[in-house]
Amino acid sequence: MGFGSCSRHALFTPAAFSGSFTTMTTSCFKRVYTAQIHGGDALGKRLPSVSSFSGQLPRHGLHRQSLAFFSTSHRRQTSPPPSPRTTSQSPTVPSKASTTPPTSLNTSKPIATESQDKTDWSIIVKLAGNIWPKNNPNVKFRVIGALTLLVAGKVLNVQVPFFFKTIVDSLNVPITESTTVWVLAGASIAGYGAARILTTLFGELRNAVFASVAQNAIRKVARETFEHLLNMDMKFHLERQTGGLTRAIDRGTKGISFILSSIVFHVIPTALEISMVCGILSWKFGWDFAAVTAITMLLYTWFTIKTTAWRTTFRKQANAADNKGATVAVDSLINYEAVKSFNNEKYEVAQYDTTLKAYEKASVKIATSLAALNSGQNFIFSSALTMMMLLGAQGIVKGTMTVGDLVLVNQLVFQLSLPLNFLGTVYRELRQSLIDMDVMFNLQSLNSAIKDTPTAKPLHLKGGEIEFRNVAFAYHPERPIFRDLSFKIPAGQKVAIVGPSGCGKSTVFRLLFRFYDSNSGQILIDGQDIKTVTLDSLRRSIGVVPQDTPLFHADILHNIRYGNLEATDEQVYEAARKAHVEGTIQRLPEKYATKVGERGLMISGGEKQRLAVARVLLKDPPVLFFDEATSALDVYTETELMRNINSILTGQGKTSVFIAHRLRTISDADLIIVLQDGYVAEQGTHEQLLAMPGGVYHRLWQAQLTESTQPTDEEIERQREELEVVDEKKKQ
């Protein structure tokens, strides 16, 4: 689900409706099902929208158990059909650089516990701060206005049965030829109509007044959560599925909407109406009527809560199967090419169907248990109405009550049936919303392992000298990457870091950029420990072209401008020319307005890398880091691009670090650092390292030399001219 939909979640309020309804189809292949509303909880039933009711209701939020799937990189495990496969797991990071562990999402405990009640209360207190902000009188005014309209609407709603009673008593007289309706009951009929109209009007005004309060609270909490997630360290994001995080935010914000709407539009009005009805019955007809009403409400509430708690077990099973099905479907579709490459369509369908079967089984239990809930609720309420009718009939026989009084009692009690019908749904959804909000607020409470110290100061660059001093680091405690790494990158020079795969070349950048912190040792820039400077100033001073180029699902212009959001179009075009991607862009039908697709999958790997180079050139930081920045380019484009980058670096005196497997791209570096087994094995210029027979660099160079030979400038120019001639002939 798109994250932006959170703010459009509808508010709910009780309204009269009956008949069947069908749930809206939601994201991640949620099933469509139907249920009958008779007076109790319904499968997936929620209160209708305040603005309109079209017969379709959104599904409820999912239980805490269903959120557990996103706590780690998750893949389903079911009995596979003929083609078994292995699954990969996301790497974890050592405890030294760990993030505060997430709150447990275990759901084996009962729904309502003492600790959970305390948590629920703390959530409500947090939410109250968003709907009653200290420095926003406009929001407070709207809350007061909504509550005033609520009370006025309920008072008028209770008057409707009184007008009905008056009409009945007025017509319960001998009728003559001169008798007219307006003479007997005209005023009462007019009052009856006015009361009903004003009740509805006040209800709609209440919804309109309170809507901005609820949506403002949703927006504020969602923005704060999203901002907090962006400030978390890399370990946190590597350990969680992005889809799971967005679903947690979405459910949490929907939970805010439901809690606000249920409290303002259901809980408070129902409690107020029950109190008023009991008071009226006791005042006008005696304590026995009020006692029957109070006992009925208590028994009805107790039965509904107990039965709903029992049914929640089945709902948890359905939610778990639903989440698993969503994970299977999304995982399969994202890896569409792999599915097709290995002809595993039937396997994926079988995996998905297994979750559908589990969902079907749980849904049948939900539907059948609904009958018990509806039957019990109907029995309790019908018994109460029968007792009321008996007491009323006795009053009429004794002469203490009129027929209109009997109608009044019936109408007063019957008006309570509608909000009580939703009691099961409100209770279940209220508990679920609190759980969903707890998950979201727990995300806000997590602390990032990488953050500014209280005394952090902005980085003061003097030239861009970088020094690693006795650095030790490991992603996994049992597999250290660096043991005692020490080297120095001179300011304003081009330095290359090379070595065998897995020696930690890319880790150098991750530590320098503070995606992770070293376990021990120091990393210095111009003599300043990077742990003592602000993250913002540090990361603004470093530009990186990563090995796996991250692109947004937007146009090319935006993806380049992302390096400097304040850059003009002309500056973007100039950066594209420097990155040798301008010609490619101009050949596209929509040029700079061309969408690159999700993760840039609609363009080639080489084009993605050149866009990344253009982006970092537009950022223009004093320190540049190229992590296999040209690995997807052909030899000719790579050579020209590197020549252009070198000219830029030479003219501006920037410190640049190149990580490369193709050694010919960094043979002109001022310094080459060779890593192996967590140490600096060798360092020097290209010529110095080649003069060390048997050295690591010498062996790597010889191995690559047998595969290809670096072309000269004349060969590059000649072959490019030949390609241009071929292209011209094709155009003709």
Swiss-Prot record:
Signal peptide: none
GO BP annotations, alphabetical order: intracellular iron ion homeostasis; iron-sulfur cluster assembly; iron-sulfur cluster export from the mitochondrion
Domain annotation ABC transporter: ranges: 466-702
Keyword Transmembrane helix: yes
Cellular location(s): Mitochondrion inner membrane
Membrane topology, as annotated: Multi-pass membrane protein
Spans annotated as Disordered: 71-114, 708-732
Record bears the keyword Signal: no
TM annotation in the entry: 144-164, 182-202, 263-283, 285-305, 379-399, 406-426
Transit peptide: 1-55
Stretches assigned to the Mitochondrial matrix side: 56-143, 203-262, 306-378, 427-732
Summary of the knockout phenotype: Increases susceptibility to copper toxicity and decreases fitness upon co-incubation with macrophage like cell lines. Increases RNA level of genes involved in iron uptake. Increases mitochondrial iron levels. Increases mitochondrial reactive oxygen species (ROS) levels. Increases mitochondrial complex I activity. Decreases cellular heme levels. Sensitive to hydrogen peroxide. Abolishes cell population growth on the non-fermentable carbon source ethanol and acetate. Decreases cell population growth rate; growth rate improves in a low oxygen environment.
Residue ranges occupied by any ABC transmembrane type-1 domain in the UniProt entry: 144-432
EC number(s) stated in the UniProt entry for this protein: 7.-.-.-
Biased composition (Low complexity): 85-95
Binding site for glutathione: R311, T312, T313, F314, R315, N374, S375, G376, Q377, G424
Summary of subunit composition and partner proteins: Homodimer.
Stated name of the protein: Iron-sulfur clusters transporter ATM1, mitochondrial
Lineage: Eukaryota, Fungi, Dikarya, Basidiomycota, Agaricomycotina
Gene name per UniProt: ATM1
